[in-house]
Each structure stands twice: as C-alpha cells, then as structure tokens.
A protein has these predicted regions:
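Domain-scale signature associated with acetyltransferase and cell-envelope carbohydrate enzymes
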Residues: 1-167
Length: 167
C-alpha cells in the first residue's frame, strides 16, 4: 500500500489496514501514494496521496485522509497563530487582541474594551505570551479522523481532530 513514495529524515508509519469510503461510494485503502515525507509521523490507517510537493515536520493522527494537496509543512519554530495581534473595533483605534487557541469571548471583550485597566491588560498579555512560547514548536500536528482534500499550501498550522479542509 506504499507506491511512488519518498522518505527523508525520520519517518514513522502506522499500520495500513483500513479502507475509507468517500462520497459517491468510492473505497480507498489506507496507504501512501505519490507523496514525499520528511520528518513525519503517520498514525494508523491513514491515506495520503497526490501531494504535489511534500509534507515536512508533522505528526499525523490516526484514520486521516489527505489527498491532492500542494504542500504541508512547518518550516521554523512557530506558535501556530498564538500571540498574534488582531485589530478589533477599528473605528475606536488601538484595540488589539492577542489571539490564542484558548481565547474566550469574555477575554477578548476585556482585552478590547478595558484599556482603562492597564495593569489587567498587561497581565493578560503576559499570560498569552507565556502560553504562546510554551506551545511553540518546530513540529505541527494533524489530528485523528481529519480529511484534507484539494488544498493548496498549509504552513505552520495545527489541525485538530475531526477537521475537514476542502479547497
């Protein structure tokens, strides 16, 4: 179940025992076809095929289906979007919110509208900076039961379980 595949760096493969049933009733066996993997861990029963360039520096979960993608890579130490400033309430000016993957609506509200409490805002920013640095990595992750189809470039992204990305 491995055809026309190149490996470099450290690559770990899980078992390839299952089949995927796609919309329309087409069945594909798990495996690797037309793909280059560099420093990748592939979980059990994944189907990865027709990757135009390569997949580099990722841990791919179990039962994941990836097909017709240009490139998937982490190319440096990244925080995966944590700690990035997003400007909100543009009409009021100076209302940046540091986003993170645990951000709640309540936290965003406080960060945007409680500028008159600079001690609170500075402490919340410090917590976000700490969280961002703690979760920074040179290896990305694609969760279990993920489907990625017909997509261009995916760079420096953490993809959670059961996510569907269709281009």
């Amino acid at each position: 179940y491995v055809h026309l595949t190149r490996f470099s760096g450290e690559v770990k493969l899980g078992v390839l025992d299952a089949e995927f049933t796609l919309p329309g009733g087409i069945r594909k066996h798990s495996g690797l076809r037309h793909v280059t993997l560099h420093n990748v861990t592939v979980g059990d029963n994944c189907c990865i095929e027709n990757i135009q360039n390569y997949i580099a520096n990722y841990e791919i979960g179990n039962d994941t289906f990836i097909e017709n993608v240009d490139i998937i890579l982490v190319n440096r130490l990244t925080t995966f979007g944590n700690g990035v400033e997003a400007t909100v309430l543009n009409e009021t000016g100076g209302r940046e919110v540091l986003i993170n993957d645990k951000l709640s609506a309540h936290q965003a509200y406080i960060l945007a509208l409680y500028r008159h409490r600079p001690e609170l805002i500075n402490r919340m920013k410090a917590i976000t900076d700490y969280y961002s640095n703690k979760h920074a990595s040179t290896v990305g992750s694609i969760g279990d039961h993920v489907m990625i189809l017909n997509t261009g470039s995916i760079r420096n992204v953490r993809i959670g379980d059961y996510c569907h990305i269709c281009g």
